[in-house]
Swiss-Prot record:
This is Large ribosomal subunit protein uL30. InterPro entries: Ribo_uL30_ferredoxin-like_sf, Ribosomal_uL30_bac-type, Ribosomal_uL30_ferredoxin-like. GO terms for molecular function: structural constituent of ribosome. GO terms for biological process: translation. One of its GO terms (cellular component) is cytosolic large ribosomal subunit. Belongs to the universal ribosomal protein uL30 family. The lineage of its organism: Bacteria, Pseudomonadati, Pseudomonadota, Gammaproteobacteria, Cellvibrionales. Part of the 50S ribosomal subunit. The keyword Ribonucleoprotein applies. The keyword Ribosomal protein applies. Keywords: Ribonucleoprotein, Ribosomal protein. CDD domains: Ribosomal_L30. The gene is rpmD.
Amino acid sequence: MAKKTLKVTQYKSASGRLEAHKACVRGLGLRRIGHTVEVEDTPSVRGMINKVNYMVKVEEE
């Protein structure tokens, strides 16, 4: 059975944000506005997304 993945897209800049939020964006693998990555659906990834939900858009697959 394939693992569930999430498509995460950054739509706001991380500059000028809290260091912890910048680290979460980096931890998700996002580098710039408009960048999209596919990440595994795990509790730790969900926590990072939840922390920076005002900067990213999420699509479930």
